[in-house]
Structures are given as structure tokens and as C-alpha cells.
Amino acid sequence: MIGKILGNRYELLQCVGEGGMSFVYKARCRKLNRFVAVKILKDEFKNNEEIVRRFKKEATAIANLSNPNVVNVLDVGTQDDINYIVMEYVEGKTLKDIIKEKGALPYEVAISIGIKVAKALECAHKSGIIHRDVKPQNILVTEEGVVKVTDFGIAKSMDSSTIAHTNSVMGSAHYFSPEQAKGTYTDYRTDLYSLGIVLYEMVTGVVPFNGDSPVTVAVKHIQEKAIPPKNINQNIPNSLNDLIMKAMEKDPVNRYQTAKEIIGDLEKIKKDPNVTISSKSAEDEDQFTRVMSPVVVPNTETNNSEPDEDDEDDDEYYEDDEDEDEEENNIQTKPQKAINKNKKKSPILIIIATILVVALGITLGFLGMKKFMEGGKDVKIPNVVGEKVEDAKSKLEGLGLKVLEVTEESDQEKGIVLKVDPNVDSTVKTGSEVKLTVSGGEGQIKVPNFAEMNLDSVKRTLKSLGLELGSVDEEYSDSVPRGEVISQSPNANESVDKGSKVNVTISKGKEIKSETINIPDVSGKSVEEAKSILANAGVGVNPVKGEAAKSEGEAGKVYSQSQSGSLTIKQGEKVTITINYYGDYVKPEKPKHNAGELVGMTGAQAKAWASKNKINVSGITSDTAKVKSVSNSGEVEEGGSVSVTMEEEKKPEQPTQPNQPTQPTQPNQQAQPEQPKQPEQSGNN
């Protein structure tokens, strides 16, 4: 089967479980690219028309359920003699596995799971579907705490060859209602009894009735009263003890009548564990056994013994058609051992009792269970067309038939039966389903199933039907793609008045956890330094060269970044930021001046020129003398230097002073009288 594609859509990947009637495969929907579970009827049943009919009929009915606590049936079909049902794929453990791992659960957890299971049953019951096999093996719990009930209404069949092997008959016997065990008419209340057993096992870690065979267990369901769970686990409140005992009443009349009732009481206990719960089963808690019929049962082990070591699904996923675990012996509790020890019976009585039990087991197993599974005796459907639905249901249920009520808009009075399917006077077996089409009155509209539709499609559909969109909530979902409907209120197929509002919950997809990272500030760092620092922080870098550096020290340094500091991201998300860094430093070109202009300037003028042009001029010796030449008569940059040569400045002659003393005469020379001189004329030659 692996690799086979069913319906040109579902590719079988691996077998994840096997039950008495079917295999379950993990598959991939090639159209929507998601995992699904595909249940395939075993080959030995493919030629049994009744089993195949029920297999498909029940699956089609479940497909119309819309509840977050129901494993959705997505498709049903036949290909190459392969009958299959496609369901949502749920990653999780069965409640049975959880109880095996942890033992008794905290009562708060049991209440929470119980409410969700009851809501799933309520949804099914409103659509006329009885589960008939409520047990921990058919309750899946995901890691996120989502509770999903599976195997709704999947018809189970048991023939005489199966009855012959009583040790492999229906591992579900631990959760049977008394009416199931007797093979009599069952209704919605049978599911509530089984839910009571599940609650019992959650808070105690054991099943209330156990035995060495399914028949023995079935007899205990009929005859014996369970030990109150509080006698086993003192930590549970009296209110929850009373609720469980009421749910497990032998007579359906004394039980909870609807799933809504049990949900209400569970909610009360959740808010106030000390609340008083009305229980019709409040009898002397020391009275563990109540005889319902004169049947002698040997080896009356205590009701509450350890659960069978292998009391679980063959599938471990979605289905429990049969268990092969009923061979283990019960472990008696100490009080009952004491009772048995004090009661000595003769071998003859034990032999007689054993024979009676074998006879009872064969009778119950072959007639009762077979009757339950195969539908019972023939009855004729009466004509209830035109009657009020309450009267019609009473008549049909009185004949042992199950009633599925469907509302249809009509000009007839609301609540009047319009049609019956199968037709009036048809012969069917007790336990068969009869569909009543009931007038919803004028203006009544059947709410469509919006599962897996997007919000736009929902709006268009509602508008075309004359309905309005109510509240739109969003929730994370591991199984429903983002943007599609998870649940709706009112539920699919409910009849409402025109203009009514329909509330939907839309999937936000899988919840993605976030984390916070710190992005370091790398301003002023070189590009390589910045890359290293950010890489150590788990941040990628996109370096971008920016403006030119204004100094040699700025060249190649980071001057800005796109993100820094604390940043919240999706867990595992890759973060890359941009950093901007300075380019190379370009030395600016300085202005140049013609130093040749200095020639001919006076020293003062040359100094002024030098100051103005920021050039160092050396060699100026006088403010009045003129520059004769320049060391560089070409272009000189600001900040540069030149030297100049100044012209010689002519000094004016000094006049001779009159009456200057004569120089002494040489010896032996006669002094000559000195002649007065004429003063020289001053001026330029």
C-alpha cells in the first residue's frame, strides 16, 4: 500500500496502526500539501455490503460535524475495491497512554479533558450520531493540550466466528454501558455512561470493572455498582465523585440525560469544587454490589483492579476495533481478598456457578453483542408524516430505532415531520437509523459547513443565504492552514432564521514563538571589526560604502547601521542589518598663487601679499626696499614658502661738521696752517 495514491490525491506514506476492521495510514494530501490519516477497511470486509455501507454512511455523517474536539472526517471513497476514510492527522498520545504513563491524573486535568470530550459528544448527538465506543483509546491529546475524540459512529461488526474467541471480543468492554452489554436499545445516554467510566479511570488510574474476559466485565456492568472513585483517590472533591457515579447509573433514566447537562456540572465543579451535585446514585458507599438480575457470578473479584496491561488500541491511532488483551487475570484489592477469604464455598457450588457463567457469557456474547452490532429484530417504520417531531421520535424510539432529525425550510408549521427515510412501512432492524425531515417553518436556513473555507468564501456564502457574519475570532492551529475556518457557531446543518449571525473562528496557522536578540552598536569600528562583533551576536551584515572620509582617521570606519539594540524576532529567524562606512580620505587641493607678483613690491607690500595668500615669504629686510627677485617665481600653494632678494637701499651722505680738529702732524714736520673747506652740496648724483 505504501506509495499508493487514493482519489488521485492522498499518497500513503506509512502504516501507523491496525485495528480489527481496518488499517490506518499516514498520508500526504497532494492538493493541499498537508498530512492526513487514511483509514482503509480490511480486505476480509470489502465484500460485506452491510459493513461497507455503514462504513461510508457513518463517515459521511461525521464529515458534517464541526467541532474543535472532534477528529474531522475530510473525505470518503472507494478505489480498486479499497474503501477508505480520510481524517485530519493529529500528532499526540491517546488518553490511555497518558494514564498508563502517569497513573491517576489531577482532578482538575480530568475535568478539563472531560468537558472537551463531552462537547464533542454534544456536537455528535445534535447531529443524531451516537459514538458507541467512548474510551481513552479513542481520545487523543496533543502536546499543546488539544483534546480530540476519534472513531465517531464507525460501525463495528462481530460475527459468530468472532464471538467464539471471547478473549479478543471488543476491548471496549471496560467502557460498555449496561444496555450495550445486554444488547438492548441504546441512545445518546450510552455515551454518557462510557464518559463516566473514562472520568473514573482518569481520577483513579483504574477501570471500575475488570475481569478475565469481556463477558465477565459485561456482566459486572449489568449487575455491580462501582466502588466510588473517592474511596480510591481521596484527593477528588465529593462533587466530582457524585458526578461520576451519576453518569455511571445502570438505568439510563437515572443518568445524565444530555451531554449539555454533564458539561454544566463539570463547569460548576471547575469553578467551585465544593458545589453540590445532585446524584440519583447516592447510595451507601459501602454497598459495592447491587444485584440487577438473578445471575450467579463466580470469582467475584473486586470491581476496581489494575487495568489490563495491554488494554489499549491495536492502532495507537484513531481506532480500536478489537483488543486482544482480555486474557490477563485481575489483581484483587485487599478488602475483597478478605471477603473472599472468609467466604468458603463448596466445589459443587463453584462448578455450578461456573457453568452458569459460561452459559451467560455465551448468551450475552452471541445474542446480546451480536444484536447490538447487527441491528436486532425487524420492525416496520410507522407513518409519522404530518405528526409533531416529538411524537414521531417517541414512536420510533419506542420501536428501538435511532432518530436523525434534519430541518428543512417549509411552509408547513415548524416542527412537523415532512419526510421519513427509509420510507414508511419499510422493514428495518432495531437500532437502525431513521431520518426525519422536519419543517423549520418559513425563513429557516440550514447553516453550511464552513470548515476549511477562507473568510471571503464564508462571507459570500452567508450573503447568498441571507445570513450575516457575526464575530470573527482567531486561534493558532497546528492542523488547519492559516486563514481557514476552524470552528463555527451555529454548527453546520443547524437551522436558523434568515438574518441570523454565524460566528467563525479562523486559523492563524501554527503558533511561531519569538525571541529577543541584542544588536550591538558598531559605530566607529572598522568594517572587519563590525562584521566580527555582529557575527558573534548572530547577526548578518550587509556593508555599504558611503560618503568619503573627512580625515584619514575616518576612512573605512562605520558611521551608521540600520538596526541596533533590542529586537524581537521569530524564533530561529535570520537577521541581517546594513552598515554604512566612510570611503577613502581624499586630501583637498590647496589654492595656488603666482609668487612672481612679489617682484617690484616694497617689503611692506610683500608682507601683505604673503598674509593674504597664506604663503610664507622670507628675506624681506625692509618695508621700503623693493623686491628684486623671488626664489620661485611660479605657482606656490597656500602654506608654501618662498624667499625674496631685496634691492639695496641707497643711504644719504652725512654732511661734514665745521671746525673739525686737525690731525696731528708727523714729528719733524712743520705744521702747516689748515685752510678752511667749503661745505659739500647734498643731493643725488
Curated annotation (Swiss-Prot):
Residues forming the catalytic site: 143
UniProt region (Disordered), positions on chain: 277-339, 480-500, 623-685
Entry keyword annotation includes Chloroplast: no
Domain of life: Bacteria
InterPro entries: Kinase-like_dom_sf, PASTA_dom, Prot_kinase_dom, Protein_kinase_ATP_BS, Ser/Thr_kinase_AS
Acidic residues composition-biased segments: 306-329
Stretches assigned to coiled coil: none
Bias-annotated ranges (Low complexity): 627-645, 654-685
Domain PASTA, chain residue ranges per copy: 376-440, 441-508, 513-581, 589-648
Protein name as annotated: Probable serine/threonine-protein kinase CPE1738
Organism: Clostridium perfringens (strain 13 / Type A)
Phylogenetic placement of the source organism: Bacteria, Bacillati, Bacillota, Clostridia, Eubacteriales
